[in-house]
Amino acid sequence: DAPVILHNLPDILDINNQIRLLQDVGVSIQRTSPHDIILQANAVDTQYLQSDEFLQRCGKLRGSVMLMGPLLARFGQAMIARPGGDNIGRRRLDTHFLGLEKLGGKILYDSQRQVFSISAKKLQGTYMLLDEASITGTANILMAAVLAEGTTTIYNAACEPYIQQLCH
């Protein structure tokens, strides 16, 4: 529920679409400069998160996968459409799913709707070894793990500076 301040956001379509998606979910976003924003997520509309409109928008934005960890941690469930968006080669979602499962998430895929559902009664910290040092996979797992009970240790985690910043 605490405000989050993000600095140096590029003014690009994917970032702006992700901001609009967060606003539609109920996140209050205040732009403090052309590249800085303050986010306040104390009025998230959990019903909207299950709507066809939300799922359609997720399907058009690869970055929507980054909502899974935080939504699972805060609300015990998340749904996203199979992410589309850019076409920059093969980027698997396995790391995201395997890490969230290790924390206690149960993942289902509806092939007809192309929707992933994940739920957990309680997330539990654990040791995990990632098959690949995925930047977004590591970030998603970290964002879920902060609200898990116990300690989470991730081996073969991505170690880019922004991942290190996320840890602080």
Where are the model-predicted features located?
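Structural preference for solvent-exposed beta-strand-turn elements
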Residues: 1-168
